[in-house]
From Swiss-Prot:
<dbReference type="InterPro" id="IPR005861">
    <property type="entry name" value="HisP_aminotrans"/>
</dbReference>
<dbReference type="InterPro" id="IPR015422">
    <property type="entry name" value="PyrdxlP-dep_Trfase_small"/>
</dbReference>
<keyword id="KW-0808">Transferase</keyword>
<dbReference type="GO" id="GO:0000105">
    <property type="term" value="P:L-histidine biosynthetic process"/>
</dbReference>
<keyword id="KW-0368">Histidine biosynthesis</keyword>
<feature type="modified residue" description="N6-(pyridoxal phosphate)lysine">
    <location>
        <position position="220"/>
    </location>
</feature>
<keyword id="KW-0032">Aminotransferase</keyword>
<dbReference type="GO" id="GO:0004400">
    <property type="term" value="F:histidinol-phosphate transaminase activity"/>
</dbReference>
<keyword id="KW-0663">Pyridoxal phosphate</keyword>
<protein>
    <recommendedName>
        <fullName>Histidinol-phosphate aminotransferase</fullName>
        <ecNumber>2.6.1.9</ecNumber>
    </recommendedName>
</protein>
<dbReference type="InterPro" id="IPR004839">
    <property type="entry name" value="Aminotransferase_I/II_large"/>
</dbReference>
<comment type="pathway">
    <text>Amino-acid biosynthesis; L-histidine biosynthesis; L-histidine from 5-phospho-alpha-D-ribose 1-diphosphate: step 7/9.</text>
</comment>
<dbReference type="InterPro" id="IPR015424">
    <property type="entry name" value="PyrdxlP-dep_Trfase"/>
</dbReference>
<keyword id="KW-0028">Amino-acid biosynthesis</keyword>
<comment type="similarity">
    <text>Belongs to the class-II pyridoxal-phosphate-dependent aminotransferase family. Histidinol-phosphate aminotransferase subfamily.</text>
</comment>
<dbReference type="Pfam" id="PF00155">
    <property type="entry name" value="Aminotran_1_2"/>
</dbReference>
<comment type="subunit">
    <text>Homodimer.</text>
</comment>
Length: 362
């Protein structure tokens, strides 16, 4: 190979492929492949976005001060330990850059978010996957793979794409089993959807220990996926390290304004959460009545398993796509028999269930 050569491991990265946005020959689409909020953004966020239009020639506040204060107020956190990013993907990468590296290992759950191994390899570290138990993070399996080379453990809680979660006591046990030098990163992107009493998003662990970080996003319940806005709650030393490696103006003027407004719209947040519960419960019941396996989920999506049909999940995906329904095939996550289906509005989910019923008859 002539010319510049990428660092070791870069060409081993399988590029991340997001959910589809179009279907040839189809004009009306139901986009249920990327776990976007069914209600879209808060009207207050849209208004705030429009209001900053005349100011987009100005650089944003590099510290995202108002947004960090709004996050602190909304979730009862110290704003000094909150950092904002261009989507939570950015902080997942920066943590690997700052704390992993050549010779280090990064642990994650077998069916965890694909960004974890990508971030590890991009930093020159080695990703190590631990098996799951019943499509749920297995604490014992993760701890069994901790070595002197382990630098980071990524845990999605709740997990994408399985929809499962670790109860608070299991998450605490995972942390207790890690050496102090290993950083536990709790990716709580779907935390706002969880109503289970035994769930914890990780903020209590961050408050008590120096080796835990929790990350969150505005892309799901808050409906700001197109803004690319995420944040992290960190120990002071980790916050200092991230400040040193992040881009100076990594969160746009528009994203900061929309984020503050979205946080203040509590009625919209509750309506989004309630609608998701309604849609997920009804859709799960209908699809199970068709004879398909729907794995339990606490998120704004469900994982549907087609193995028992004796037909490929990809066939079902293509059938849905031809009807303008875009869902996500899970082969890249090691779940080739499954489709992940985002929860839309109730009428939309009825349409999806009807289409699956038609496919099963074919």
């Amino acid at each position: 190979m002539s010319g510049p050569i990428p660092n070791p491991g870069i060409l081993d990265i399988a590029p991340y492929v997001g959910g589809e946005h179009s279907a040839p020959g189809v004009t009306r689409l139901l986009r249920l492949a990327s776990n976007e909020g069914a209600l879209g953004p808060s009207p207050r966020a849209v208004e705030a976005f429009r209001a900053v239009g005349p100011e987009i020639h100005r650089y944003p506040d590099g510290g995202s001060t108002r947004l960090r204060e709004a996050i602190g107020h909304r979730f009862g956190l110290d704003p000094a330990r909150v950092l904002c990013f261009n989507g939570s993907d950015e902080v997942l990468h920066l943590l690997a850059q700052a704390y992993a590296g050549p010779g280090g290992e990064v642990l994650y759950s077998r069916h965890g978010f694909l960004v974890y191994p990508i971030a590890a390899r991009a930093a020159g570290a080695t990703p190590v996957a631990a098996p799951e138990r019943n499509l749920t993070t297995d604490v014992d399996a993760l701890l069994a793979r901790v070595s002197e080379r382990t630098r980071i453990v990524y845990v999605a809680n709740p997990n994408n794409p399985t929809g499962s979660y670790l109860p608070a006591d299991a998450l605490a046990r995972l942390h207790a089993g890690l050496p102090p030098h290993v950083l536990l990163v709790i990716d709580a992107a779907y935390a706002e959807y969880v109503t289970a009493n035994d769930y914890a998003d990780g903020t209590a662990l961050v408050a008590r220990f120096d080796n835990v970080v929790m990350t969150r996003t505005f892309s799901k319940l808050f409906g700001l996926g197109g803004m690319r806005l995420g944040w992290a709650y960190c120990p002071p030393a980790v916050a200092d390290a991230l400040h040193r490696v992040r881009s100076p103006f990594n969160v746009s003027v528009a994203a900061q304004a929309a984020g503050v407004a979205a946080l203040e719209d509590l009625e919209f947040q509750e309506r989004s959460r309630a609608l998701n519960e309604q849609s997920r419960t009804a859709f799960t019941g209908r699809v199970r009545a068709l004879g398909l396996v729907v794995h339990p989920s606490v998120c704004n999506f469900v994982l549907v398993d087609f193995a028992a049909t004796g037909r490929p999940a990809e066939e079902a995906r293509q059938f849905l796509k031809a009807r303008g329904i875009l869902v996500r095939q899970m082969g890249a996550y090691g779940l080739p028999d499954c489709l992940r289906i985002t929860m839309g509005l109730p009428a939309e989910m009825e349409e999806v269930a009807d289409a699956l019923g038609d496919w099963l008859k074919g």
